[in-house]
Amino acid sequence: MPQNLLDFDLAGLTAWFGERGEKPFRARQVFHWIHQAGVTDFAQMTDIAKSLREKLQNEAVVQAPAINFAHLSADGTRKWLFDVGVGNGIETVFIPEDDRGTLCVSSQVGCALECTFCSTGRQGFNRNLTVAEIVGQLWVAQHSLKREPNRTASDHGAGEIAERPVTNVVMMGMGEPLANFENVVTALGVMLDDHAYGLSRRRVTVSTSGLVPAMDRLAERCPVALAVSLHAPNDALRDQIVPINRKYPLAELMAACRRYLVHAPRDFITFEYVMLAGVNDQPEHARQLIALTRDVPCKFNLIPFNPFPDSGYEKPRAEAMRVFREILQDAGYVVTTRKTRGDDIDAACGQLAGRVADRSGRVMKRVHREAA
């Protein structure tokens, strides 16, 4: 079976070439052709010896996930559904803004963590994505957007073709990135490599629900910006809505955040907080957050819940959001309220579901629970 070269970072590709008697600079050339030029046909890699091109055609492929469909939101947000085989699909979202282009990347087919307010978690879990499937989302987005006129949220008309449409990557799509640790770290290495996409560590963010041991490993192996899906200010509530908290409670999570900051490219952790009407959006919850995070340099990203069918939750009132935000701001915190982008194409936070052939049994267990 041919080797998919998208599965390699530069070190891995160099080793693979070495096993075939090829010099390291040849690996760098091919790496550049694949990631910077967007070329998948070895015959078009014209500065490479014909004999090597023929060898690659026999032994390798460059294969990103196939696009099943693409949607364009009224606000300029784009969503792709990628086919990753055996009835499974993953979703990837591109959010254009005047000063950046952010790609929201998936790391798993489904998610095993069962956060109760997340559409992905409702779909069950099938498998981890390969490196090629993770990097392939960026590869497709970068090179397909390069061929299109640059569009922003404020100007949907034609413009100059962007040299680098994707300036930021957030691992906030389907799945828990740190539960697919090795593949995610390898993919991050490709994203950061100057021979590939050359993204800054400050512009690549991994989001986790709180897998504490993996947070420590990420700090050692590939410290990028870190976002923690917090969503509750106390263990009793977080145990209910973010079940991984039962394994790694808040005291352990806050300690892991402090350790991560020793290595992080930014001097703060971003705490993501999906606000659920009547559940975690009251003033006392904001005050509990202040007490919880007083020893962790951080900012808060408040996210109004994005409804999906049968979620059981409602979007918070604007007044509740305002009061909550002001309590945090008055305590000296930087607080942002995430704009809802792409909700008309189900591309907003918490709405990504794709297609998941559940192998975990979680969907049927949930159906039986809800029917009881």
Curated annotation (Swiss-Prot):
Record-listed S-adenosyl-L-methionine binding positions: G175, E176, S207, S229, L230, H231, N306
Compartments (UniProt record): Cytoplasm
Enzyme class: transferase
One GO BP: tRNA methylation
Cofactor or coenzyme needed: [4Fe-4S] cluster
Family: Belongs to the radical SAM superfamily. RlmN family.
Protein name: Dual-specificity RNA methyltransferase RlmN
Source organism (scientific name): Thiobacillus denitrificans (strain ATCC 25259 / T1)
Gene assigned in the entry: rlmN
